[in-house]
Amino acid sequence: MIKQFIARQMVKRTKSRQLPLEILEQKHVDLKEPFPNDSSYFYGGDKEGNAFITRMAFRGPDRTHEYWFDFKFKDLGFFGLHEDPGAEGKGFQQGNLKWEPVEIGKIWRITYEGKVTGEDGKEHTCETNLLFTGEHEVYDFAKSSDQRLIADAIASSKWNRSFFFNLKDTHQVHYEQTGSLTGYIVLDGIRHEIKMWGSRDHSFGSRNWTTWDRHYWITGKSDAGYSWTVTTIRFDFLGRLTAGFVVEPDGTVDAVVDCTDLESVSKNKLLPDNAVIELKMRSGKTHTMEFFRKGHFPYIMDHKYLMFEAIGNYKFDQVEGLGMVEFGFHSDKYSL
């Protein structure tokens, strides 16, 4: 009982923080954290099978920064940035890869000019100018995580110095937003217009990829006007944690408090091509979605954690939709 009470107080203190939007949207690399990390991500996709993804993570002077910049054109294949884009700049910038806020909390510009590599290993020239436009306010995951379930997971764990050191990874600030991605990509002098559904996230705090066991992260939008994000993560020092939200067509936001577990989603295949996930909401509602993976962008984090960002089609409460399907696994523990 004492552990349970202490755990609930710990979670309550962590989840009570609220930062102004103009502060949230800045880069935060706190060198006092065990594993400093500021990570942001943009994704876009359309029903024709075109997709775009970019991510930057700034991790302090002692760890290598992370970068993703990849896209798929349905008739041309996959292209991506395979070499370091350059030194960290002011704000969200690594070399020629740059993101700039146009309107805080709503609109961001993504630009890149340089080389990308195709599936055949050949280099191509690329110029990118995209705008992400949010459809609703940013959603802080501190509002959606079920504090009772988190406290239960903490209380049931063995408490020692190592546990509390690793627990700092769960104290990140993390928010997301769905919307649209528009603009153009010029590939080898040919301009391709981009008009996609989009999603973005931003998190900062401490992150040590080697303590992650496995996870999935699902985000998308249905033709009926629902958009959603749900994630469930299992660490090697802590049980499964779940968070997420559903934005209804009228703009009402409902928090995800539980979802189908990792083992059930992957019962037939560790990296499933499709599966059904049930969402339990704070309002008492439930939603059912089925995803279908259509190719993916692979990444490896800190040489240990495998990430697969898949182009996704959905049925959300039986209505068609599209989005992104992310699965991750610790390479020492799982073999695909």
List where the protein language model places each region.
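Structured soluble/peripheral alpha/beta segments that form catalytic or ligand/cofactor-binding pockets
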Residues: 1-336
